[in-house]
Amino acid sequence: MSDIALTVSVLALVAVVGLWIGNIKVRGVGFGIGGVLFGGIIVGHFVDQAGVTLSGDMLHFIQEFGLILFVYTIGIQVGPGFFASLRVSGLRLNLFAVLIVIMGGLVTAILHKIFAIPLPVVLGIFSGAVTNTPALGAGQQILRDLGTPVDLVDQMGMSYAMAYPFGICGILLTMWLMRLIFRVNVEAEAQKHESSLANGHSLIQTMNIRVENPNLNNMAIQDVPILNSDKIICSRLKRDDTLMVPSPGTIIQAGDLLHLVGQPTDLHNAQLVIGKEVDTSLSTRGTDLRVERVVITNEKVLGKRIRDLHFKERYDVVISRLNRAGVELVASSDASLQFGDILNLVGRPASIDAVANVVGNAQQKLQQVQMLPVFIGIGLGVLLGSIPLFVPGFPVALKLGLAGGPLIMALILGRIGSIGKLYWFMPPSANLALRELGIVLFLAVVGLKSGGDFVDTLTQGEGLSWIGYGIFITAIPLITVGLLARIFAKMNYLTLCGMLAGSMTDPPALAFANNLHATSGAAVLSYATVYPLVMFLRIITPQLLAVIFWGMG
């Protein structure tokens, strides 16, 4: 058997063993995809014992390409929400999550200086303690750029594996500890979260209002400031028994019923100006109007603003809502359309069909993957990661590397959405498949390289010490920030658990947090809010630590 065939066969065996290990769960918690690392260690141990030689160049390529695939697909997935998560609504959550990352880096630095832990080892412990595989790849990349011998770089994977198990268990223990210390009633916390959502600005709602303000009688909708803003959409108007789709030039009369869409505060302000909220139904049932959802799949409308498409003037159709990446938004006239956006339309059947033809509404297109943008994005990301940044006082030029470059490029492209006929939307199933393939390839190679010396290091070397260092890196930031968030910020317990899981980019921890309450979405919401920024910082942190310590030592 050739070296290439043998290497591929061994990698396939590692994936099978590792994924089987990852599927083993104790009380609902398992290693998940991290099991591939331990599958690689097991197979690597026996491969080393048998004296089998694998293709080193091929293993190196597979490891790096797997990492690129993983971080790129993460960036495409979270890109649309990344910059939004940095705004005020998620600012507090992100600040606490960033504090966890910073404290983890500080604890790592202190352990490195006090116990003189070799740089590759301490970076591996850090990556394993925070259960972040891209951090491992980024650390190995910068160490190679700094000229670290290959055998020392491979130690990083071994120390990562030592610290990884408590990295997963530590966050679960922290959640349990917070619940114990503060005597949390999970049901009460879930109700508080639902109440805060209902009173906040995060949900798009509707309101039916009767026109009672005499100053509005015989005025056009476009002349009423609250109705001519991008905060409120008037999607239906009922006069006597006639339901119609209003246009900006529609004249309002006293007694008209308006169906408005917007955020709760804006709807309340509109009600104060216009008249009284009523329970009268403005349903399209039994009328010649209907409400339908259509999806943007036509490349010709990508990047165009809603106002430029003139749907109301041309087709007598109103867009009442816009759903992007699962988030309901008011259909602002300045909003630019992206591939996969879902529009809520109100109008006559023939008119809605005409608009659907314009925007595409081809469901099968949502399941297709444009491979050209994928490789353009990966290529640009690798180029970005290879650009040297010379900083005075540092021994080598800083680079984003093969982990940071594709991630940042994917975040940017995911946020842009499309350029001309190229769009960076990727079906969730395709994104997940590429992401899982990438991380399996990466972890399989890391495990194989670490497996030969793993048992000796654990039983006769410093493996137990590495585990102890990892416990400090995991526990100190999580417990400290958990206490601060609960005591001083009065953070909801379920929101806190999601934030802690997101700060460690740990899906098993998110699954555990979700199981705390069957119906509350608090944990998922906070996890998704902090995940993009934290993933970026987790990849950058080991590179900064490596360059700083290399310069000092």
From Swiss-Prot:
GO molecular function, one term: monoatomic cation transmembrane transporter activity
Pfam families, alphabetized: Asp-Al_Ex (PF06826), TrkA_C (PF02080)
InterPro entries according to UniProt: AAE_transporter (IPR050144), RCK_C (IPR006037), RCK_C_sf (IPR036721), Transpt_YidE_put (IPR023018), YidE_YbjL (IPR006512)
Biological process according to GO: potassium ion transport
Matches recorded under PROSITE patterns: RCK_C
Nuclease found in the keyword field: no
GO cellular component labels: plasma membrane
RCK C-terminal domain mapped to chain residues: 192-276, 279-361
Coiled-coil blocks: none
Subcellular location(s) of the protein: Cell membrane
Membrane protein topology class: Multi-pass membrane protein
Entry keywords, A to Z: Cell membrane, Membrane, Repeat, Transmembrane, Transmembrane helix, Transport
Transmembrane annotation, as ranges: 4-24, 28-48, 65-85, 95-115, 158-178, 371-391, 393-413, 437-457, 464-484, 493-513, 533-553
Organism domain of life: Bacteria
Record carries keyword Chloroplast: no
HAMAP family tied to this protein: YidE
Protein name per UniProt: Putative transport protein YidE
Organism: Salmonella typhi
Gene name of the encoded protein: yidE
